A protein has these predicted regions:
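Domain-level signal for soluble alpha/beta catalytic cores
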Residues: 1-117
Length: 117
């Protein structure tokens, strides 16, 4: 039921919005950061890639989160990346796991920020 990001990127890019939020951490979508290598981000637009997944109880290590952020930043520019989550965490995960994932996101973003800026 999930479509490949490459199949819908053109529609994405036609939207007149300030940013794009999309899954990028789940096993189904983790490889799709490469789509941005072949498509320019519209001027003045940012991306909100999911760098922690709602599809597993495993808490991502901050280094993995940082690596995911850096992958996107190297393609679209660090000023155009705002780290996010894959969908909402509350409906599928225990609250303690959701908070741990958010803490990992913060720590990973700090690492990526130090390395990129």
């Amino acid at each position: 039921t999930d479509v490949p990001f490459a199949d819908i990127i053109e529609e994405f890019l036609r939207a007149e919005v300030g940013g794009f939020s999309f899954e990028a951490a789940s096993p189904r979508h983790a490889h799709e950061w490469r789509v941005w290598q072949d498509h320019a981000l519209p001027e003045g637009t940012v991306i909100y890639p999911g760098v922690v997944s709602h599809s597993t109880n495993a808490v991502e290590h901050p280094r993995l989160v940082a690596d995911r952020i850096i992958q996107f930043a190297e393609v679209v520019g660090p000023e155009n990346v705002i780290a996010s989550t894959d969908c909402g965490l509350g409906g599928r995960l225990h609250p303690q796991i959701a908070w741990a994932k958010l803490q990992s996101l913060v720590e990973g973003a700090d690492i990526a920020t130090r390395e990129l800026f």
